[in-house]
């Protein structure tokens, strides 16, 4: 077995198709294998195109493997540019989004990346719809668990607000050599996201995709039965429960109930004026339902010799597993891209992205909270409603609190305008200028609603809160980034030289204002102006600037001997001025 130059290929895999029989080639490229006369051999070797060869009764075969030029020429996105995968000297992983996305019903880029790249750990912060995830590269390497720097088209951005269908590829820079070009902010690695662009000389096309999926818990905690729970009270030496029930009496009632529950059709017994709960309940199942999720995406694109364009719109609608629609997430994405080759040496590009999201989750400041109560309350805790002094009141189960409480609402808007200008003075040199404006706003509202309920443990009427409270928080961030850099690439015989150098400037301003007030006049219309309690206000503001110079030099001899150096010098307003 040889290559196109007649050199023997050592260690190529040779397997009989459809069988487990196989071998590898030796130092001279030879192999010996017993096969049927009509066998087909599958031959594979890294960097070469796989082949299937028919034996056809022959005793000797001469096989020539061709180099897989597609693999050898594949490029990977790195800091401020691309490099041939074969010429990489640092630890870089790269994936094409279309290859890992497929038809998976995912709502965010973070979901897609779970398990998709070696060394990248994606961890969920919660199970609520639309919850953000955290990234970690090569494990935790500091006590603060620093996060990697995430860049979208060379600029910082929250990838959770991107539609996965708008992403072309993702590269992860894992080591210091690869991420040094981004300075100290890249100490925990870098995630580079490249979005989809229009393609020249392509016909107008429309693409539409959707996904529908259902969700439910795969495994829930199992609680002790009422009999086991009360027996545990007795084993601990408890004579009377905290609300007065006699433990021995309770045990006898439970044994009788387990033998013949029809004697207590209401699921409880009243002895000496004290209520004994007997029926086993499941608070977790009571507060859950089957979740439903749908995603839609439509895109149009095309181009001629000088202009290319792409536009897309996407929608995510996710209802969680908790009862009612107070456990939900909706997101709308719009993206527009255009590129024009005004002249052979100048190319402007414009990319505008907008995302709007709205999420709701059950909110209560009551003790335990929704999930805490579902786990902590015993399995004899009653469900539904209870009559107390002639008044029908909801019991303080998680199900009822979800229904009666107001949800915590989170509204986000994210506008990103990205402009790029590429100038090519001559063949081997490109000068690139990029400007990005990113405006992010968020409004968070919470309302502690006051309502009466029956406590399922002490059977008394209580209030959810002493005073209703309405709170609204507004955040706004304006981010500006400017990059200008030049790439020079030259090939001289077997020598390949690449030089890149540039300047980066970023500014970020953040403002937050929060206000709250208690004692709503109308619980159904919470508002700061429709309340009688005291105001409580607070605000925050932050501003910083970063400027940096960066470079990268690559050298390759005959594609076999590689040398790369890169670095960055930064100045930041976060540090005090030194002289």
Model-inferred region functions:
Residues 96-100, 352-356, 568-574:
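Conserved short loop/turn motifs at secondary-structure junctions
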Residues 69, 194-196, 209, 299-303, ...:
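Transmembrane beta-barrel domains of outer membrane proteins
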Residues 577-579:
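Short glycine/threonine-rich loop-to-helix capping motif typified by GTGT followed
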Residues 481, 548-552, 560-562:
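Short glycine-rich loop/turn motifs
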Residues 201-280, 316, 320-416, 432-547, ...:
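Surface-exposed loop/interface segments of Gram-negative outer-membrane beta-barrel transport/assembly proteins
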